[in-house]
């Protein structure tokens, strides 16, 4: 191994796919809602909602042109809501989170939300039509699989009658056959507290007897910080009928054309079950992909190599590193950076992953995290462009963006249950202004603000390049930071540089996280020329720096061949 090879990655084991997936997460409830007259903490009849039909041909063509390959439809599976209109049956408001409810408090795994349909009685047909439109546009569809928990009233609204644990459509109903006199039995779907009523942190008369364990805590008395709107599913670490019931859930949606599942909070679910599930589903649907929401980096290898996930969130790795680097620079100005705010963390994280890197799902936004343009993060969407160059272009791993990110959505509305926290609420009926403008712009019915349009053009250029270029989708990576620590103008804590190469194409990418423009010399060592098999020339060699100008909080790409 030659010196510097630890800064290069060439061979990946168990690579799931050759192309680089680019995933667009979208909440249909918000996407198609063009209502401007919004009232905080108000219902669907006042604030409105988007529908399946709003994921139309124009929207999907826009996503395809943007460079997207997969659309993650969030909040599709039927969940608890306080709504009694548009075909919805309300759950108890004492535990429903927000008027619209949480998309992760599932009331029926085999149904979609009636409010997303023009005709609630035909909601499954409208969902199927959306999936067909997605495929017709050359895109793949992802939905959530929530294996850890369900809503407190799961099964209450399943098609009746329920006989022998199955509803009128033949689908299994979790908990229907449980023995509620026992705290735990291997054949029970839930955990019970015999003789103890549920004590909610909210005031009211809601009665659950016996209490069931909540999604994140084994207790009949969840706190306000717990997932008190949910009930924990009992899997055991060995095969049970519950495993089969959940297998039916995934196969039901895969048979309707769903191409992938983003699996929620899998660290709370036995790995024995998840491994069995993935293997079993892929026997029936070999092309279906599984993405895990995982936060413990020490478990990454297990979830890929043993459990069989195609991709994992790299929230605790690259996302956290870029978050701290951005906030350290944007919010602290020219103040000295702490080590955890240094761009060196990008290299450290990358080296720690090794051959797991192509299985990481890189992102800068999702429904759980604060918006880049929020006052709590980078303040403006353009201030995150330096991070975009790294997260999107540094390796072959997939990349995800959250709807409105490309237009600089700030997430600074006070919708209702979700206050002004820098996030776009998933609990309320709402319509973010920048998302409305983006929707109208796509359909030729309105325009974006100048700053939004400029940011969108940058995203289009970067995403379309990444999705259409073999050097990004398949190329090797060489980190140049170790050999530029003392290069003129290069700040190891604020700048990041790397090379991508595939075939005859070689590009240099440089990011500047600082708040001032930077002119720098980038040295390419002889080890890089040798390892990348690039012949040195009079104009490009190990002794002659590449002179680069990088605007503040931005990045550049330079074609070296």
Report residues per predicted region.
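C-terminal beta-strand-rich structural cap/linker in extracellular carbohydrate-active enzymes
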Residues: 22, 542-561
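Conserved, mostly hydrophobic/aromatic
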Residues: 26, 63, 73, 109, ...
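Beta-sheet entry/capping signal
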Residues: 21-22, 69-72, 138-142, 259-262, ...
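Alpha-amylase-like alpha-glycosidases and glucanotransferases acting on alpha-linked glucans and related
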Residues: 18, 105, 115, 119-123, ...
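Loop/helix patches that line or flank the sugar-binding groove of alpha-linked glycan CAZymes
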Residues: 34, 38, 81, 97, ...
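N-terminal structural segment of carbohydrate-active enzymes
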Residues: 1-140, 148-150, 155-159, 226, ...
């Amino acid at each position: 191994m030659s010196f510097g090879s630890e800064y290069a990655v060439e061979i990946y084991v168990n690579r799931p796919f050759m192309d680089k997936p680019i995933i667009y997460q979208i909440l249909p409830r918000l996407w198609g809602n063009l209502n401007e007259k919004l009232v905080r903490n108000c219902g669907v009849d006042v604030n409105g909602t988007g529908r399946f039909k709003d994921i139309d041909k124009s929207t999907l063509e826009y996503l395809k042109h943007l460079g997207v390959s997969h659309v993650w439809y969030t909040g599709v599976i039927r969940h608890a809501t306080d709504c009694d209109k548009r075909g919805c049956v309300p759950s108890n408001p004492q535990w429903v989170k927000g008027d619209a409810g949480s998309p992760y408090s599932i009331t029926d795994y085999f149904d979609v939300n009636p409010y997303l349909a023009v005709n609630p009685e035909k909601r499954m047909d409208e969902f199927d039509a959306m999936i067909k439109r997605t495929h017709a546009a050359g895109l793949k569809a992802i939905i959530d699989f929530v294996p850890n928990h369900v809503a407190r009233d799961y099964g209450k609204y399943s098609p009746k009658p329920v006989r022998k644990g199955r509803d009128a459509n033949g689908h299994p109903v979790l908990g229907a056959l449980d023995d509620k006199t026992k705290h735990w039995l291997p054949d029970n779907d839930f955990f019970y507290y015999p003789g103890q009523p549920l004590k909610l942190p909210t005031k009211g008369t809601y009665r659950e007897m016996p209490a069931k364990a909540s999604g994140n805590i084994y207790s009949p008395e969840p706190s306000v910080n717990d997932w008190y709107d949910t009930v924990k599913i009992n899997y055991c670490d060995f095969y049970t009928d519950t495993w089969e019931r959940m297998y039916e859930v995934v196969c039901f949606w895969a048979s309707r054309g769903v191409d992938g599942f983003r699996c929620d909070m899998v660290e709370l679910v036995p790995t024995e079950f998840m491994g069995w599930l993935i293997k079993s589903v892929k026997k029936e649907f070999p092309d279906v992909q599984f993405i895990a929401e995982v936060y413990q980096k020490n478990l990454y290898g297990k979830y890929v190599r043993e459990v069989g996930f195609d991709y994992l969130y790299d929230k605790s790795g690259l996302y956290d590193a870029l978050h701290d680097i951005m906030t350290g620079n944007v919010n602290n100005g020219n103040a000295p950076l702490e080590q955890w705010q240094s761009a060196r963390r990008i290299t450290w994280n990358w080296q720690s992953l090794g051959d797991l890197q192509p299985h990481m799902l890189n992102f800068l936004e999702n429904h759980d995290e604060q918006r880049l343009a929020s006052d709590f993060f980078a303040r403006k969407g353009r201030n995150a462009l330096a991070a975009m160059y790294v997260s999107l272009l540094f390796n072959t791993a997939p990349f995800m963006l959250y709807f409105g990110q490309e237009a600089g959505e700030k997430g600074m509305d006070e919708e209702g249950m979700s206050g002004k926290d820098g996030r776009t609420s998933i609990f309320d009926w709402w319509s973010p202004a920048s998302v409305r403008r983006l929707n109208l712009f796509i359909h030729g019915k309105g325009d974006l603000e100048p700053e939004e349009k400029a940011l969108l053009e940058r995203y289009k250029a970067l995403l379309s390049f990444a999705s259409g270029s073999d050097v990004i989708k398949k190329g090797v990576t060489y980190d140049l930071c170790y050999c530029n620590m003392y290069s003129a103008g290069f700040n190891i804590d604020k700048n990041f540089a790397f090379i991508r190469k595939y075939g005859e194409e070689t590009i240099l990418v440089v990011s500047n996280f600082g708040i001032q423009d930077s002119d720098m010399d980038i040295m390419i060592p002889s080890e890089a020329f040798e390892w990348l098999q690039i012949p040195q020339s009079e104009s490009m060699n190990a002794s002659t720096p590449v002179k680069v100008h990088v605007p503040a909080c931005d990045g550049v790409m330079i074609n070296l061949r």
